[in-house]
Amino acid sequence: MSWMYVMPCANAVAAMRKHLDLVAGEGRACTELMRAMDGRVSLKTGAEAVFVAMIPDRKLGLAMKIEDGNSRASEAFLVGLLTQLGVLDAAHPMAQKRLPAPQINWRGYNTGELRLADGVL
């Protein structure tokens, strides 16, 4: 990668790690999961269930897109991936909130569970 791009990217990641609350806002997966990992990983979701993650300590970047555009699936997959990589504790409440994720209908009934299919990771 050209040095022309390296410094702006590094600056953006550093700003995201320092100001977690300004990335997405309270209650959003980006903010909650970055807090859960103490800012070691920078995350950002975009439109139609696009998610990116940057793990500077490992020099690793991830990008994913969920075809149907549903953020529930992208959040669950991202939590599964980050726990497999060892950067997110699966027992953390913010991870547990998203995987496995009970699906509650408007009457408050549990109608199922969102989980990763066997062999996905």
Predicted regions and their residues:
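Structured C-terminal helix/loop/strand segments within mature extracytoplasmic catalytic/sensor domains
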Residues: S2-L121
